[in-house]
Structures are given as structure tokens and as C-alpha cells.
């Protein structure tokens, strides 16, 4: 009977796992749990009967009594285990959830350790830091590197859709090229201010840089969600300042429950608030175009660490980890991701430079920030708007690299370079603020 109890408990555990899996609507989570189950050691099937000898002449009554006692003990044990599982389940529901991106980030770190990619990152950091250390005047070099980016001209003849739909743009000063603008699901007149960018020499994956929709325009909001569906965007990183949008303002863009437009509806299936284990608030949406049987999911990640017109001065580790997760997220092979800010330009472009620089480090190479920034700016006008933003792209990638450096000497050198860059970026940001104040006066 004890072996029968073992089998019962095993079936109960499997049933509990199945219920949890069924409750989850996120594909990445289901894959993760399936992987965990497959890695468990297989147990031999329990026998349904216990063979007992009667060589000592034990009476039938004694045997029946013994079996009855065992059944009572087993029943009590099963009830106890069942109550414990209920308590555990209740704790899981009230406690902080571990989301797919959290799992993906931890798995990525584990894979990096096992596969040797950590050594690649350290190799790339070593080469890069040595290059930066040789520069006598690193500040002058950064200023000189940023100048051609800042003065890059936009050919307005290649921005016809932008000029035609200027009323649906956050700013008339952030242009949009026709060649790589986001298209809808085949509709000729579809428009949304977003750009498909790619740097094939670094990654085969493309990334969409987009503005936030106009909150007072139902047409703009609808176009935003149509873009998400048409481009199969499964993850969107929303870059805002901590006090830039309150809860009410944020819900105008991303509904707390359900919202229906003329041609598409969105349903908030789950919200995971920011916590110690989860660096950014995550909103999971079911995005269903009209007359579409499928209900694809999109995850909105609220990255409230980057104030408008400035650069972050804290949470470098959180920012670097978020940047590293853009391409390391477990999304479908034919899906894409998007980086969104108010204009989809300065912050979004700078963050993407940091993302691409991390890709280079993971390949064991020192990134050329100037080349990456020039490429992104040539595809998305006004991407990387200020010198402090340009300098901060170095800080993002070096902070990521620092986490994977084991050599104490290299670690110390990397920390020193980050400190120098941070000081320079903050000084330039203060200078720009003073200039803005003088202009306003």
C-alpha cells in the first residue's frame, strides 16, 4: 500500500503541474515547464499489489487488520500532502510571479556560463577597454565621433508618407523614411510612425523603433495595435521616465482590461508588477484583428528608467540586463520585438545601440559604437539625439560586460572607464540643461 501511495502522490503531482501549465497563457512559460519535467529522473512504475508471505501462519483477520491500518495511514498522509499542496498553491498565487522574461534572463546567464560565451564577452571587453585606455583625450574623441551623427541630414523627398500623415506623428521634427517604415497587413494607406531597422553585420534580427501613439487619437491607438499584429511583435520595450506617465496616463495607451477598436481588439490577460525579482512591469495582451481566428500574444515591458531628454543616472545593471534580453528573449522565430519611446528617436535609438554593442561583446569582439550609431541614425532620423545619449550607449554595453569579467585587473580597469564616461555624460547633460534654461529665459 505504501508503494500505491507513492504512485498516487506522483499522479497528484503530475495533475497539479498540468493545472498550472493549463492556467498559463504564455507559450515561453509552457516550454520552460515542459523542459523542467523532461529533465527529471524517470521513476519506475509502482506495483499495484504488495506480495506478502504467510509462512508464519498469520491469520486472515490479522492480515485484514494490518491492511486496514495501512489504508488509514495512507489516507491521512494523502490528506496531509493535499492540504500542504493547497497552502503552497495559495502562496504561489499571492506571491510575486516569475515571468517568462525572468526565466529567460536566468537561463541565458546559465547558458552563457556553460557554453563559454562568458569568455567571449570577457575577451571582447578586454580588447575594447584596452582601446579606450590608449586614448589620451577620450572626451574629445567622443565629441568628434558624435558630430557626423548629429549633423546627418534627412532627405525629405524620401519621407512622403510622413508628410502626408503628419497629424498622426508625435513631432514634425522626427521624420520617417518611406523605404523602411512599418507597413500594415497589406493595406496601402496604413500609417504608423515606426521604422524597421537592422544591422546584418551584427545580427540577423530586425528591430522596430516606434513612437508612442497619440493618446487622444483613437485612430493612432488602433494603428499601433494593428502594427503589433501585422509585424508579429511579441515583445515591446517602452522607455519612459519614472514620473513621465502615471497609472491613468499609461492605461490610455495600454488598457488595464479590454479595449475594442474598429478593426482590432486587445485584452489584458496578465499584469506582473515590478519587484526585486522582476526588474520591469510586464503587461501581457491578447491582440486579435477583426475576422482573425488566431489570438497572438504581445508582452509590453514598461522600462521606467530613462527620463525624457536626459540619460539615466542609476540602475545601470537593470538597464544592461534589459538590453541584453532584447535579442535573448524566447520569442517565435518569425516574430520580432520593438523599442518604443515618446518620439521613438533619441532614447529608443540609443538603447538599440547598446543592444547591438552587447551582441558584439557576446561574439567576442569590441563594438564600434560610432559605426553602430551611424547605421541606426541613417535608418531612423533623430535616433541618438544628444551627446550624453551617445556616451551612455558605451555605459550600457560596458556595464553588461563588467558583469561577465572575472579577471580582477580587467574588472578594475572597466569600472574606471565606466566612471569616466559617466562623469563626462553627466557634465554634458548639465551643460545642455543650462543652455535650455538660458534659451527659455
UniProtKB/Swiss-Prot annotation:
Active site positions: 337
Cited SUPFAM superfamilies: (Phosphotyrosine protein) phosphatases II
Keywords recorded for this protein, A-Z: Hydrolase, Protein phosphatase
Region (Disordered): 1-100
Ranges of biased composition (kind: Basic and acidic residues): 30-39, 80-95
Domain Tyrosine-protein phosphatase: residue ranges: 142-400
Catalysed reaction equations from the record: O-phospho-L-tyrosyl-[protein] + H2O = L-tyrosyl-[protein] + phosphate
Compositional bias (Polar residues): 50-61
GO molecular function: protein tyrosine phosphatase activity
Highest taxon in the source lineage: Eukaryota
Catalytic activity, EC: 3.1.3.48
Family per record: Belongs to the protein-tyrosine phosphatase family. Non-receptor class dual specificity subfamily.
Protein name stated in the entry: Putative tyrosine-protein phosphatase B0280.11
